[in-house]
Each structure stands twice: as C-alpha cells, then as structure tokens.
Amino acid sequence: MSKFNRMHLIVLDSVGIGAAPDANNFVNAGVPDGASDTLGHISKTVGLNVPNMAKLGLGNIPREQPLKTVPAESNPTGYATKLEEVSLGKDTMTGHWEIMGLNITEPFDTFWNGFPEEILTQIEEFSGRKVIRESNRPYSGTAVIDDFGPRQMETGELIIYTSADPVLQIAAHEDIIPVEELYRICEFARSITLERPALLGRIIARPYVGEPGNFTRTSNRRDLAISPFAPTVLDKLNEAGIDTYSVGKISDIFNGEGINHDMGHNKSNNHGVDNLIKAMTSEDFKHGFSFTNLVDFDALYGHRRNPQGYRDCLHEFDERLPEIIAAMKEDDLLMITADHGNDPTYAGTDHTREYIPFLAYSPSFKCSGLIPVGHFADISATIADNFGVEKAMIGESFLDKLV
C-alpha cells in the first residue's frame, strides 16, 4: 500500500534558489552563472511576499544569505530543501528529464545566434518557401509575429525562430500557409534535427490568425518532440497501471511517454492551476501522480529580465496555493520545485545554472522541517518508492523523511 495515495508535483519553471556548485561552467552573454540567484535577487531587489510558500518552509532552505524578504518559519507546515542538477544542461527538457530520473550527459543544442544557413536552406528547398532571416534568433513568440507577420502576409515567407531551449519554432498565418502545410514543414524540420550539430528537443508549429497589429496564436499548435532516451519513472508508473496526469507542457517535454491523462496546454499559470485542481478533484483520479508545469515565470519574465513581473507572478501563484491544498485528500502529497534558474536580474537572457527549491506538504504530516540537500532525480526516486515501482537511472528516495 502506498504511503501517499496521490502525489502532485508542480514545477515552477525557472524558479532557482542560488548558483549551483558548477555554475561557473555555464555562461550568460559571456558572464559565468556563478553569481546567479533567481529567488535571492528577486527577494533582494524588488521584494517577495509569498506567505503560503514561506509557511511550507521556503525561507528555511539552507543558503549562504537567507532570502531577504521571505522569513524562515520556526514551525513550518512542510518539508524543504534544495536540489542540485547533475546533467550537462540547463534547459527545460534536461531539467524535467532529470527530475524523472535520467542523467543527460550530452546536452541538446541551442542556437543563440540563430540556426545555421544549412538548416534554413534545407527547409526552403523542401517547402518551396523562403525563410525570413531576420527572425532567425531567440525571439518572443508574440513579438515575432507582430514584427514579421505583416511581411509574411505579403510574401508567404516562413517565420523561423528559437528560444533559450533547444527548439525550432515556425510561425505561420493560417490564411497564408495552411495548417496542414505548416505541419508538413515542421515534420521535415524534425527529420533534419535529430543528431548533432543540431540535436533539438522540439520542433513547434505556431499557427496564428488576425491582421497586422492584432495577431493571435491559435490552438492549432503542434509539438514534435523526441522521446526520452531511456525509461523514466513516468514510464514505470504507466507500465504498472498507475494514473499519470500531465498539466501544461509536461506531455510535450516527454513526447507523451508515460502519460495516460493529459489535461492539455496552459493558457497561463492561473489556467494551469485551474487544470491541476480540475484533475485533483476528478472522481476518476483516485490513485496516482500528477505532474504540472507552470511556465509564465520563465517565458514572460525570466528571459525578458523583468524582476517586477517575475515577483508578481510568484505572488499570483502563492495566492492560489491554498486552493491547491484545499483540493488535496488526507493521504495526498504536494511537491513544489523548479527545473533550472532564470535570474531576471542577471546578464544575458538565458537560463541560469542553479539549485532548485523543493517543498513538500501533506495533510497527514506529523512532523516538518529540513531534509538533506539532494539532486533533481531524488524526486522521481521518491515517487517510485512510494508507488512500488523501480526508479529510473539515478536518484535516491527520501520517502522515509516525509513523516
């Protein structure tokens, strides 16, 4: 019998808690990540008021300098620690795959200066359409269609862009480039980005509609991912017949592997919380695991180096946390963590190599406090231990610490 009948893991995308020991091996605009500290710098520069996460023990997590505006709790209601990444990467897929038990020794390729001409030329030859070279760089998905949508409507050229993650995205106005044609082009792009020097995690079709100045992305997005290179704990749970619920982009990150209930993409963090609560309160979800990604911290504020917006986004999530807790059953476990850092006060616009926070809460807890500092994959090892399945490649369970 499982110690916790249901386990819920929420990834606050990019909410790091201080530079990892190997942070200086990773850079942002030529600056090593060694001084990065997402939560620390937000707390120090613009203030952070997250009483519900603080109550669980966020301010108790060991740090050289305590979080300036998140007080430590003398009697927290949950368990807290920080976790270190061992994989060679600081992107979304690497972080999530390691959380689910894999050790990524060869990171995916990212393209901060845009994709090489060879890739663009191959896509042009396959599609019969030109590629807009000026969009070929890391770009906001809404800004790129605002900037180049009018030109695409006139010329039929492809808008190709990337991000901090190992992705190639193609935006196309549905009235100019039909969705099925866009999908075919993306499938070709997927076929030529499966190995180095362009090993990409995902190809994303980004259809949109509207007129210049009023473009809107549609729900016809399609992600062409690659599956994890080895079974994750999600696969182990699925094979054992245990329910696994995906909220947000989790299913895309794992290419659907090990997911048997997908709640769909989130329109926003708040929509993601709504979807999580919908799953938690479903009569069908009696036993199993839910896995949620809330990406707004990263996509809207981290890469754009907006500490005020990032802080407000954290406040917004913290205000919803009591609703999530209210949806829990007595023998549920809630876990809150991250997948990497993205310090909005730091150099550059890329992710930062950081520890991630880990908070755990159950209505059944008799005790609380700190658990030892560990590694990302300890989360999945703990999940596997709870449900009686094998862990994946790496990770050590701390299930016995949660009492």
Curated annotation (Swiss-Prot):
GO terms for cellular component: cytosol. It catalyses: 2-deoxy-alpha-D-ribose 1-phosphate = 2-deoxy-D-ribose 5-phosphate; alpha-D-ribose 1-phosphate = D-ribose 5-phosphate. Pathway: Carbohydrate degradation; 2-deoxy-D-ribose 1-phosphate degradation; D-glyceraldehyde 3-phosphate and acetaldehyde from 2-deoxy-alpha-D-ribose 1-phosphate: step 1/2. Its EC number is 5.4.2.7. Mn(2+) 2 binds at residues 298, 303, 351. The keyword Isomerase applies. Its main location: cytoplasm. Keywords: Cytoplasm, Isomerase, Manganese, Metal-binding. Binds 2 manganese ions. Disulfide bonds: none annotated. The keyword Kinase does not apply. Its cofactor is Mn(2+). Mn(2+) 1 binds at residues 13, 339-340. It is an enzyme of class 5 (isomerase). Pfam families: Metalloenzyme. InterPro entries: Alkaline_phosphatase_core_sf, DeoB, Metalloenzyme, Phosphopentomutase_DeoB_cap_sf. GO terms for molecular function: magnesium ion binding; manganese ion binding; phosphopentomutase activity. GO terms for biological process: 2-deoxyribose 1-phosphate catabolic process; 5-phosphoribose 1-diphosphate biosynthetic process; metabolic compound salvage; nucleotide metabolic process. Belongs to the phosphopentomutase family. This is Phosphopentomutase.
